[in-house]
Amino acid sequence: YGVEVVVRILSAHRTPKELVSFIESIDGEVDVIIAAAGKAAHLPGVIAASTLIPVVGLPIKSSTMDGMDSLLSMVQMPKGIPVATVTIDSGLNAALMAMQIMSIKYPKLKEDLKTYRQEMAQKVLDDDKSINQEL
């Protein structure tokens, strides 16, 4: 879809200074941040507390709780520090959510997302037709 991305590996616990420095350096340069984290999963919340850039939290399955610990850490944010959170290990939905947020600013992206949804709907209809022909 032509969306420019920056990928970093940083930790809210192990590299907090570098994380905050990076967030400060991209202020005004990016439209949305996707923050993937497992276990305690404080990364999206720390980022959201450090910037007004929208943050999409992506919980990762990485512990004995199958990612539920990560998910709950992200959705239980305190009032005033929101993190838009998708389902566990759902990188595609995180990207689509980020694109939807960006589509407010970029009309071409909105059209691309409409086309994507139309293609998904058509696939369901094609699958329905195909299975009924097999019966």
Where are these regions (language model features)?
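Glycine/small-residue-rich loop that forms an oxyanion/phosphate-binding "nest" at active or ligand-binding sites
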Residues: 50-79
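Glycine-rich phosphate-binding loop
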Residues: 22-59
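Short beta->alpha connector loops at strand-helix junctions that form conserved
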Residues: 9, 58-61, 84-87
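Glycine-rich phosphate/diphosphate-binding loop of Rossmann-like nucleotide-binding domains
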Residues: 1-14
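C-terminal binding/interaction regions
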Residues: 5-6, 68-135
